[in-house]
């Protein structure tokens, strides 16, 4: 069954929405982390909101925030099973559809 989550989304310039998003299933070497804390940096997110982010992969719609602390709740087929339940720091992620 697909997992849903709530996320802040910037769908277009100068617009912020709270949306329900579908969480991607972990690929074989990936893990799924339930976020407890995430940071929003004033510089990066301001550029995203203003539509001035130079990185080509960051196109609208975008979910801001890329540093997360949370607990591993699911592991992919080739990911170490001992990671389940571990608290981790994530410095970037592939998360939402």
Where in this protein do the model-derived segments appear?
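Residue-level recognition of beta-strand termini and adjacent short loop/turns
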Residues: 12-14, 27
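Short glycine/threonine/proline-enriched tight-turn/helix- or strand-capping micro-motif at secondary-structure
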Residues: 14-22
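Residue-level signal for short segments within beta-strands and strand-turn junctions
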Residues: 9-11, 50, 72
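Intrinsically disordered, low-complexity, positively charged segments
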Residues: 16, 40-41
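Short structural boundary motif marking the start of a folded domain
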Residues: 2-7
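Glycine-rich beta-strand-centered segment in the early N-terminal region that forms part
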Residues: 23-40, 52-96
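Cytochrome P450 core scaffold surrounding the K-helix E-X-X-R motif
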Residues: 42-50
């Amino acid at each position: 069954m697909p997992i849903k989550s709530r996320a802040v989304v910037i769908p277009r310039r100068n617009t912020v929405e709270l949306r329900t998003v579908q969480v991607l299933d972990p690929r074989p070497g990936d893990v799924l982390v339930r976020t407890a804390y995430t940071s929003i940096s004033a510089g990066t997110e301001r550029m995203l909101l203003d539509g001035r982010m130079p990185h080509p992969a960051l196109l609208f719609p975008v979910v801001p925030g890329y540093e997360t602390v949370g607990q591993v709740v699911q592991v992919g087929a080739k990911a170490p099973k001992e990671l389940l339940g571990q608290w981790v720091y994530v410095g970037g992620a592939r998360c939402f559809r």
